[in-house]
């Protein structure tokens, strides 16, 4: 698998506080990479660097290099709209817009200037099917998306992210606010989709990381401690601190 996103010596500071210390990490195309580590270790901060979601935070400074398909995303030639079209995001709390399921999923297409109603209809249906929420919504496309359960709302958000056909989807603890059944359904969806898209997922749930990810990266206090194939890391981590974390000795 080729590398689709690469991070080289990435440092991030909020004023005088340095949250990330020289992260070097490559993400392979059409795999799911889990970012794990204790609360406050920099997982979500790093994730948000990958499509520049940190840009509007006051007093933030980012150095180093992050490339998407070989292009420096912090370079002057980077089109931010194009970047976020290709690198979508799903947040911890379900965030459907306060309008219909159809309009939620079609939103990105319309913003991108797609006017072909037939194409939009087709893409909405395809995306809802990909996110495993079509059966629950096909007869309720005009219903307010916020009227659905939390797990259903999160799958609608995944469908919304997929509708513009991104190459990468960033997931910031996408199941942490959901019940176990809804979490399991989201995991099944990711397993079905991870050979079509590249997923990078922050999770506190080590069992979840073990179940769904191909690669895992362990962060601690803003440092990348270890990264590699999930099965190898979970069975035979190279660092003692990784073993301690995976075995619940802290975190």
UniProtKB/Swiss-Prot annotation:
It catalyses: phosphate(out) + ATP + H2O = ADP + 2 phosphate(in) + H(+). The keyword Lipoprotein does not apply. The keyword Cytoplasm does not apply. One of its GO terms (molecular function) is ATPase-coupled phosphate ion transmembrane transporter activity. ATP binds at residues 37-44. InterPro entries: AAA+_ATPase, ABC_transporter-like_ATP-bd, ABC_transporter-like_CS, P-loop_NTPase, PstB-like. One of its GO terms (biological process) is phosphate ion transmembrane transport. It comes from the Bacteria. Keywords: ATP-binding, Cell membrane, Membrane, Nucleotide-binding, Phosphate transport, Translocase, Transport. Residues 5-246 form the ABC transporter domain. Signal peptide: none annotated. It is found in: Cell membrane. One of its GO terms (cellular component) is plasma membrane. Its main location: membrane. Its EC number is 7.3.2.1. It is a peripheral membrane protein. It is an enzyme of class 7 (translocase). The complex is composed of two ATP-binding proteins (PstB), two transmembrane proteins (PstC and PstA) and a solute-binding protein (PstS). Belongs to the ABC transporter superfamily. Phosphate importer (TC 3.A.1.7) family. Part of the ABC transporter complex PstSACB involved in phosphate import. Responsible for energy coupling to the transport system. This is Phosphate import ATP-binding protein PstB 2. It comes from Lactobacillus acidophilus (strain ATCC 700396 / NCK56 / N2 / NCFM). The gene is pstB2.
